A protein has these predicted regions:
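Catalytic core of membrane glycerolipid acyltransferases/transacylases, capturing the structured
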Residues: 48, 63-120, 127
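Conserved beta-strand scaffold positions in the cores of enzyme catalytic domains, especially
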Residues: 55, 92, 112-114, 171, ...
């Protein structure tokens, strides 16, 4: 079926940097709280029953230490598809336009922090580094925003490479397959979604990587995501699960 057209996007948030300081401060000092578990409890039946979400190799996500989970991005539901199979509480970068009353309360207490869209937002990286320095987990999309076409982007943004090199954190590439059609829910079309967690990647820490280094690492991470995605496309959920089990 054809994809429902996404709403027109605003690619630059006009609100000043200072508007978002309190959201960053909360994530840096307190992080996700009881709201994370409430959202998880409410959404888990929807993910498992309506979207038949299942995972492959979620144990590739380390149970401790700083971790960056790096998925592709098709849907507003991708946060939840990725996090529901991970036992740790994860923190998410999300576009700043989402931070409006009253929903921003759920975001800030649920582990979400803003990236000021259309700006070189260093505050978002400071927040991410703060979470990682405490041994936390960050979800960061390689492509930046959601794909409007339903296909993987031609190339990743270099931000994932920047964070990987500066932090030295473990990277877990993730392929989310099927979520491009989640936007068709208004037509009562509910796709089957598969989330495959790849083998962990690690890079030597580089305090101040140049743009070329950032892009090179981003390309490597995204290359692994594309490999996982292509496997799901060719072999399906069951086929890839069998391949992973056979390789262990």
């Amino acid at each position: 079926p054809e994809l429902v057209e996404m709403k027109a996007q605003v690619y630059k948030d006009p609100r000043p940097k200072e508007h978002f300081d309190r959201f960053h401060e909360r994530t840096r000092t307190k992080g996700a709280d009881w709201m994370y578990e409430v959202v998880r409890m409410v959404l888990t039946p929807i993910l498992f029953v309506i979207f038949r979400a299942r995972c492959i190799a979620s144990d590739n996500v380390p149970q401790e230490g700083p971790v960056i989970i790096a998925p592709n991005h098709f849907s507003f539901m991708d946060h939840f598809f990725v996090a529901v199979f991970v036992r740790r509480r994860v923190h998410f970068m999300a576009k700043s336009q989402l931070f409006t009353r009253p929903i921003q309360f759920i975001y800030t207490h649920g582990g979400v922090f803003p990236v000021r869209r259309g700006h070189d937002d260093q505050e978002a990286f400071i927040t991410a580094h703060t979470v990682l320095a405490k041994g936390g987990t960050i979800v960061m999309y390689c492509e930046g925003g959601r794909s409007r076409s339903g296909d993987l982007a031609p190339k990743p943004k270099r931000g994932i490479g920047k964070l990987a090199l500066e932090s030295g954190a473990t990277i877990v590439p993730v392929a989310i397959y099927g979520s491009a059609k989640v936007r068709n829910w208004k037509r009562l079309q509910f796709p089957k979604v598969t989330v495959q967690y790849g083998e962990a990647l690690r890079y030597e820490q580089v305090p101040d990587p140049d743009k070329g280094q950032q892009q090179e690492v981003a390309n490597e991470i995204f290359g692994e995501i594309k490999r996982l995605y292509a496997g799901l496309e060719e072999h399906g959920r069951r086929g890839m699960a069998q391949k992973v089990r056979a390789a262990r």
